[in-house]
């Protein structure tokens, strides 16, 4: 069954941010996706920081206009 986990890429290695139930040396497929911030910032031509701030405001019910 497919499972989605978050990982960080450091020194050429993907490191999972949570425990994974895999045997040592087991092969998996990794699908890379842009974060919402990266994809929206590229479309809107605004900084990642401004997009992050707007998403935080929306999450907390603040008016972004």
From Swiss-Prot:
Which UniProt keywords are listed? Toxin-antitoxin system
Question: InterPro entries annotated for this entry?
Answer: AF2212-like, AF2212-like_dom_sf
Do you know which Pfam families this protein is assigned to?
AF2212-like (PF01954)
Q: Which SUPFAM superfamilies match?
A: AF2212/PG0164-like
Q: Which Gene3D superfamilies match?
A: AF2212/PG0164-like
What's the domain of life for this entry? Archaea
Q: Which family does it belong to?
A: Belongs to the UPF0165 family.
Summary of the function given for this chain in its UniProt record = Possibly the antitoxin component of a type II toxin-antitoxin (TA) system. Its cognate toxin is VapC7 (Potential).
Could you tell me what this protein is called? Putative antitoxin VapB7
**Which organism does this sequence originate in?**
Archaeoglobus fulgidus (strain ATCC 49558 / DSM 4304 / JCM 9628 / NBRC 100126 / VC-16)
